[in-house]
């Protein structure tokens, strides 16, 4: 029997996934562009791996994975997975607000189509 509390596992999966994406983009943008030469690229990427905020993004992905595994003990995949489309909504809105990325009509329309398609697919 499902309890409303069980949906917290799905919510945690979404929250930690969105956090991970936003913190990675924010921190990488602060560190500058990827160098053009091979040695510079490798050095840059290795430095990213040891950045504490980047590490927190990876840790968030790990926590999201654990939350998803917990959700899978409570829900059928076909019921739970459509909720993951909310990642698109939250990343779009929060990247506009926190990262000052443009929120264009095309992006909003595209995300709306994804959510609508998810609702249609999960209701059948």
Each PLM stretch: what is its role?
Residues 1-30:
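Glycine-/small-residue-enriched transmembrane alpha-helix faces in small-molecule transporters
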Residues 6-12, 43-63:
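Loop-to-transmembrane-helix transition segments
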Residues 12, 59, 85-89, 108-112:
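Hydrophobic residues within alpha-helical transmembrane segments
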Residues 14, 18, 62, 88-93, ...:
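Hydrophobic/small/kink-forming positions within alpha-helical transmembrane segments
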Residues 27, 71, 97-99:
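Hydrophobic/aromatic residues within transmembrane alpha-helices
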Residues 66-86:
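Structural motif at transmembrane-helix junctions in multi-pass transporters
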Residues 89-107:
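C-terminal transmembrane-helix exit sites in multi-pass transporters
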Residues 106-123:
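Hydrophobic transmembrane alpha-helices of multi-pass small-molecule transport proteins
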């Amino acid at each position: 029997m499902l309890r409303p509390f069980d949906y917290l596992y799905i919510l945690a999966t979404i929250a930690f996934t969105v956090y991970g994406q936003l913190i990675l983009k924010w921190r990488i943008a602060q560190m500058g562009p990827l160098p053009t030469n091979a040695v510079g690229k490798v050095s840059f990427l290795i430095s990213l791996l040891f950045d504490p905020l980047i590490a927190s993004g990876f840790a968030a992905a790990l926590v999201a994975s654990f939350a998803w595994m917990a959700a899978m003990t409570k829900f059928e995949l076909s019921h739970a997975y459509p909720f993951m489309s909310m990642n698109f909504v939250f990343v779009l809105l929060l990247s506009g607000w926190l990262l000052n990325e443009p929120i264009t009509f095309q992006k909003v329309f595209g995300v709306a189509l994804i959510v609508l398609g998810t609702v249609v697919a999960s209701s059948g």
